[in-house]
Amino acid sequence: MRRAKITRETAETQIEVELDLDGTGRYDNRTGVGFFDHMLDQLARHSLIDLTVRAKGDLHIDDHHTVEDTGIAIGQALTQALGDKRGIRRYGSFHLAMDDALVRAALDLSARPYLVWNVDFPAQKIGTFDTELVREFFQALSTHGGITLHVDRIHGLNAHHIAEAAFKAVARAMREAVEPDPRMAGVLPSTKGAL
């Protein structure tokens, strides 16, 4: 069973995450940050990972802690659900077009966290959501999920489209990487003998 449940509690946030890598993309995400919920829904739908998030944070300050801590918890849940990573494809990449936006994501479930982020936004906010929090989410996801992640904006004029294309591109790359590879059943996808 490639499932996980994580609870993270700090003085700033209380987060619960449940995910199923072998899902159908079902989602039920409630963080108190509307645009972020919309992005998490995209992440689930397009990765085919079932995802449920419940978050309560210090939104009276801003959205930062809620977004970052949700990324931490989802990353931890991914690590738990993947186990020793035997039999997975490990790598994934995708170019995602959404209207004016074109974003490329490539990732390696290597247990070596590293984020390369080449995504600029033409606006600092999408509604009330700070666009810089998109990077914060993926930094937390990469670090706590042990993911080498590259995300590049190739084109884009609209901040909402760019952010959504980034989440969808990462989702499609993740879908590929977590997929069981029948030719590698029970085999670790590394010559090192460990990931």
UniProtKB/Swiss-Prot annotation:
Pathway: Amino-acid biosynthesis; L-histidine biosynthesis; L-histidine from 5-phospho-alpha-D-ribose 1-diphosphate: step 6/9. The keyword Cytoplasm applies. One of its GO terms (molecular function) is imidazoleglycerol-phosphate dehydratase activity. Its EC number is 4.2.1.19. It catalyses: D-erythro-1-(imidazol-4-yl)glycerol 3-phosphate = 3-(imidazol-4-yl)-2-oxopropyl phosphate + H2O. CDD domains: IGPD. It holds the Pfam family IGPD. SUPFAM superfamilies: Ribosomal protein S5 domain 2-like (SSF54211). InterPro entries: IGPD_sf, ImidazoleglycerolP_deHydtase, ImidazoleglycerP_deHydtase_CS, Ribosomal_Su5_D2-typ_SF. This is Imidazoleglycerol-phosphate dehydratase. The lineage of its organism: Bacteria, Pseudomonadati, Pseudomonadota, Alphaproteobacteria, Rhodobacterales.
